[in-house]
């Protein structure tokens, strides 16, 4: 009889651990590994987009925040960085504070597919090809005609860029959202 009770107790403990584990917050899966854009690539991305102080830049997959921070510091633009990784968001906020641009930039921990970026005048990306392709319809739907889109390294399939430049080993692609 004691063996049956012990087995039943062990079974109940196992069931409760499974239930607890299922109710714990799940770590968000990252679609894109973090790879920082080189400073010369960031500069070229902002230059090709013709950034100025009136721009609102959304960097989707912002990592350490270097693109929106550079846009704020060097061009006076405002920026929003979006990343799903809380560690990158924390790092981006620390970097913005160190560069004294917290009044110009903010960072959001969120899946980029759930963000409303319709207020952007410029969107920057350093994602993977399949993520760019998945994001493309949302860019075309949400962004106003004339909004500029710049991607480090990866294109958007059959959406031909208006400009394409090489910076070292990197290729930068530039599009403008067309009239609807």
Where in this protein do the model-derived segments appear?
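Conserved class I S-adenosyl-L-methionine
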Residues: 54-63
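Gly/Ala-rich phosphate-binding loop of Rossmann-like dinucleotide-binding domains
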Residues: 72-76
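Glycine-rich SAM-binding Motif I of class I
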Residues: 65-69
């Amino acid at each position: 009889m004691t063996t049956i009770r012990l087995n039943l107790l062990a079974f109940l403990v196992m069931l409760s651990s499974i239930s607890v584990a299922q109710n714990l917050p799940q770590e968000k899966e990252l679609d894109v590994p973090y790879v920082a854009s080189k400073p010369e690539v960031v500069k070229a991305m902002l230059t090709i987009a013709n950034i100025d102080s009136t721009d609102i830049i959304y960097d989707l997959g912002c990592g350490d925040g270097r693109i929106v921070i550079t846009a704020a510091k060097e061009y006076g633009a405002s920026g929003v960085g979006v990343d799903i990784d809380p560690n990158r968001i924390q790092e981006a906020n620390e970097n913005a504070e160190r560069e004294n641009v917290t009044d110009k930039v903010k960072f959001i921990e969120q899946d980029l597919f759930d963000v409303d970026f319709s207020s952007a005048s410029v969107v920057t990306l350093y994602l993977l090809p399949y993520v760019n392709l998945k994001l493309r319809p949302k860019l075309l739907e949400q962004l106003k005609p004339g909004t500029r889109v710049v991607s480090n390294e990866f294109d958007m399939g059959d959406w031909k860029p208006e400009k394409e430049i090489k910076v070292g080993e990197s290729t930068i692609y530039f599009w403008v959202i067309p009239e609807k």
